[in-house]
Amino acid sequence: MAAADALPTSSASASASADGPRTGNPSTDRAIAMLLALVREGVTDVVLCPGSRSQALALVAAELERVDGVRLHVRIDERAAGFLALGLGVESGRPAPVITTSGTAVANLHPAVLEGWHSGVPMLLLTGDRPAELRGIASNQTTRQPGMFGDRVACIDVPAPEETDDDLARDALLARDAYRRARDERTPVHVNVAFRDPLSVAVPDLTEAVAEVRAAAPATPAPAGPATADVLDLPHGPRTLVVAGHAAGEAAEELARAGGWPLAAEISSGSHFGPNLVVSFRELLAREGFGDRVERVIVFGHPTLTREVPLLVGREDVEAIVVGSTGGEDYDPRHRVTAHPAAVRVVGEPADPAEARRWLGTWVHESRAILDEATAAESAPLLPSGTTPAERRDFARAELAAVRADVTRRHLVRALWQATWPHDRLVLGASRLIREADRALPGKRVRVHANRGLAGIDGTISTGLGIALASQAGSGSAAAGITRVLVGDLTLLHDVGSLLIGTGERVPRIQVIVGNDGGGTIFDGLEVSRTAAPASIDRVMFTPQRVDLASLARAYGWAHLRAATHGELEAALTTASEAPLLIEVPLAR
């Protein structure tokens, strides 16, 4: 959609009139009107980066924090701020406005905006800008900001303010409409706000204004369900596999249970649990009698972690149904999807109940056998404690050897899974480790997030911080939980600036666990590793790094633990720390 007509410009109305005291300064009064409108809509968190052109918004946000109107999160790096807002939106389901000044500050939001658009996360960008007369004439720190994020991100360019009631009411309505669109459509929305000198004055006390807008706040609407006409009825007939990709939610597990069908659920799907779960679906899709017998596949979410799923969806002999959408594009590998309903439901009964039970049972049984075999290969042999001195000595030696064993990737993800409870949050970076987790971890109802919209390593730590801040701010069980972020060393270094949490900022309970294998070993498993020269692979793909992570953590005010053995890892994951904790786990390449 075009930037100019992306959002409506509603006329003033009593239901969204400009509230709060006036200062006589158009910039400050605009900021008060817009941010109070957002508080009225239910905004609880605001992220901002310092800057001159956006100072009115920043100073009003600071006053709102002072009077407990919002929780304010200040960052000096706009890329980190964007992903922090993304994490807040992931956890809460509501956009957390992110405020920046003009120029490259806006451009640095782009990675988070792309991830938000592709993964269906609500975001609201409030970017300061020069007035029209200062654009296009090489003014300092001025570029073409409207439309910077492309024609897929809704954008409105708000002209510099005048001091009239109609203008302030319009500003409040624009803020309201932008917020609602981001929330309801689960997408980024960009409001580019021009300010003219003088850029701010002292902000008045907003205590009464916050109380008034909260008293008048509308109830948050319940998510609208799909129209009856867009619900597809599914008969039991064909041999069916349910696939839950990233952000599928619990609907995939519910459908698999209702239909009596096997469930192939990726680790960040939100459906990686339940009696129908098939963890080892990759192996079975390639095995005779399993993948070749699938007649229908029903996909929820965005599958990104396997090649087997898109191959299955693209087969001519398989009916492919993709339910809903988790981002700006519909999942349709090889353009073979036959239906794309908003929702589905199971109708009727199986024609052959015994055959239906066998179909599900063989998938679940074989998957568990594969998983048990892999677990046994990684685990220490089970020995009886013994009654004789020799038997007790052998048992003690075996126990000690298990504790002292080096950590492997599979053991790392299993130990992390075992330490994580339903009230905790787990964030997985884009590396070999998320694939290891996807292949090795049994079902468990744990909230797992990964930035799989574009599957980049950008902003993983900052996303995790946003999820931690949002989950621990509420009154539910998650408020007592901890957020663990599992990344590779390159993912950590790419987002290292996010470790900087400024003085006076909220510090959540968080552990960043770094699988440190000295570079990008994910490329060792790709085709390029079999065709390119090893020296070239190391130079331009593996990109070896040597960083003292203990010193790095200390520089940013994080605690640091090194966990090279099973025993050290178990102790580290259960360590209580006042400071955020970075756990370094050395891994072999």
Curated annotation (Swiss-Prot):
Protein's UniProt name: 2-succinyl-5-enolpyruvyl-6-hydroxy-3-cyclohexene-1-carboxylate synthase
Highest taxon of the lineage: Bacteria
Protein keywords: Magnesium, Manganese, Menaquinone biosynthesis, Metal-binding, Thiamine pyrophosphate, Transferase
Cofactor(s) listed in the protein's UniProt record: Mg(2+); Mn(2+); thiamine diphosphate
Organism of origin: Clavibacter sepedonicus
Low complexity bias: start-end ranges: 1-18
GO biological process, one term: menaquinone biosynthetic process
Subunit details: Homodimer.
Protein function: Catalyzes the thiamine diphosphate-dependent decarboxylation of 2-oxoglutarate and the subsequent addition of the resulting succinic semialdehyde-thiamine pyrophosphate anion to isochorismate to yield 2-succinyl-5-enolpyruvyl-6-hydroxy-3-cyclohexene-1-carboxylate (SEPHCHC).
Chain positions covered by the region annotation Disordered: 1-26
Single Gene Ontology MF annotation: manganese ion binding
Cofactor note: Binds 1 thiamine pyrophosphate per subunit.
Keyword Magnesium appears in the UniProt entry: yes
Pathway assigned in UniProt: Quinol/quinone metabolism; 1,4-dihydroxy-2-naphthoate biosynthesis; 1,4-dihydroxy-2-naphthoate from chorismate: step 2/7; Quinol/quinone metabolism; menaquinone biosynthesis
Catalytic activity, reaction form: isochorismate + 2-oxoglutarate + H(+) = 5-enolpyruvoyl-6-hydroxy-2-succinyl-cyclohex-3-ene-1-carboxylate + CO2
Gene it is expressed from: menD
